[in-house]
Design a protein with these regions (language model features):
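A glycine/threonine-rich phosphate-anchoring loop and its flanking beta-alpha core
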Residues: 101-193
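C-terminal charged capping/lid subdomain of soluble metabolic enzymes
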Residues: 173, 275-349
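Active-site segments that bind and position negatively charged phosphate/pyrophosphate groups
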Residues: 187, 191-300
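Generic secondary-structure signature for well-ordered alpha-helical cores
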Residues: 81, 147-150, 156-163, 171-183, ...
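Catalytic, metal-anchored helix/loop core of enzyme active sites in primary metabolism
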Residues: 1, 218-220, 243, 339-349
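Short glycine/serine/threonine-rich phosphate/pyrophosphate-binding segments
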Residues: 94-101, 122, 238
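ATP/NTP phosphate-donor binding region
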Residues: 1-86
Length: 349
């Protein structure tokens, strides 16, 4: 069944409508400790949720693991969930990823609705059917493709976010601009993230979601063009896992932004991406995201992490690169020297 994405101007009305189209002998609402405090109050008095069962998990990506997943399964079981129950995931990407995985595996699958509350989840995590958890220090190592019945996007939740979380989600929007068209990219690399115009941002969010929807609809299980969405993610996931391993975790969008620096450099070297556009994009990222401190001694660990990437085939590290804005080159390979050169550029500029 095709996932429906609703850009909502009236959250209660649209949630009631979505619930009415789903089986629901019982309703469970999954939040983490942060969204329970900041976002649950915005919907807790909705009549449709008056008899719901709340499930609250610990916040942050470090808890996106088997232990937390088991807690959710146990809460569903203790709450009397059946195959006809409904779970609503209210939160950022950690909640929608883990909650979607829990729902899609409990009793072989129950319906779920995603209400993303972070910019990152609105434009990326909650749309497209990817669910999962981290395992063995690796990002999203275990998971399944499973569409929520509905994704309800309501930008009122953006006022709960700090600047870092706005920037984190914006990195995925920048990626969507790079794989889309020049007009979208040009608007994104000139947007003032320090003083965001929320009306403009809301319009850009809707456009960004449409970019991802078009790609996912064409290739739901990532056999071809959906790999375009992996721009920045081969290096980005390595940066993210590396930071997690050394006990200094970074937000996913920051990791993707750093990954785009290396992969745009690789695009300029290998697939003729225009150097002026590379430098303009890299300058925007450096000004808004800072950097991740790495040394040459870290390169073997980072490359080892890239070897674990799910996009790889036969032990060869695969990248999504660009020939130009909107000119996507999937299944690109690079040897270790080329990767080290890109890491040098990331580190030294």
């Amino acid at each position: 069944m095709k996932q429906k994405v609703v850009i909502s101007g009236n959250l209660e009305r649209d949630l009631v409508s979505a619930i009415s189209e789903c089986e629901h002998d019982r309703i469970f609402v999954l939040t983490d400790e942060t969204t329970q405090q900041l976002c649950w109050p915005k919907i807790k008095n909705f009549k449709a949720l008056k008899d719901c069962t709340p499930i609250i998990i610990k916040a942050t990506d470090t808890h996106k693991n088997l232990d937390t997943l088991a807690e959710v399964w146990q809460a569903l079981s203790n709450g009397g969930a059946t195959r006809h129950s409904l779970m609503i995931n209210l939160g950022g990407g950690m909640v929608t990823d883990l909650g979607g995985f829990a729902a899609s595996t409990f009793k072989r699958g129950i319906d779920f609705i995603n209400i993303p509350t972070t910019l990152l989840a609105m434009v990326d995590a909650s749309v497209g059917g990817k669910t999962g958890i981290n395992f063995g220090g690796l990002k999203n190592e275990i998971g399944v493709f499973s569409d929520s019945r509905f994704v309800i996007i309501n930008t009122q939740f953006l006022d709960t976010l700090d600047h870092d979380n706005i920037c984190s989600g914006y990195a995925e929007m920048l990626k969507h601009g790079l794989i889309s068209d020049e007009r979208t990219w040009a608007e994104l690399v000139t947007f003032d993230l320090d003083n965001p115009d929320l009306n403009q941002l809301q319009r850009m969010v809707a456009e960004s979601i449409k970019v991802k929807e078009r790609i996912v609809e064409t290739d739901p299980h990532e056999h071809g063009i959906r790999k375009a969405l992996n721009l920045g993610h081969t290096m980005g996931h390595a940066f993210e896992s590396f930071a997690m391993r050394r006990g200094t975790p970074i937000l996913h969008g920051y990791a993707v932004a750093y990954g785009m620096i290396g992969e745009l450099y690789m695009s300029a070297r290998k697939t003729a991406f225009p150097t002026d556009r590379m430098h303009q994009t890299v300058r925007f990222i450096r000004e808004n995201y800072g950097t991740l401190n790495i040394t040459c001694d870290d390169y073997p660990t980072l490359i080892e992490l890239m070897h674990h990437d799910k996009k790889n085939t036969s032990g060869i590290i695969n990248f999504t690169l660009l020939g130009n804005v909107g000119d996507i080159r999937i299944n690109q390979t690079a040897n270790e020297e080329e990767i080290k050169e890109a890491l040098d550029f990331f580190r030294e500029g």
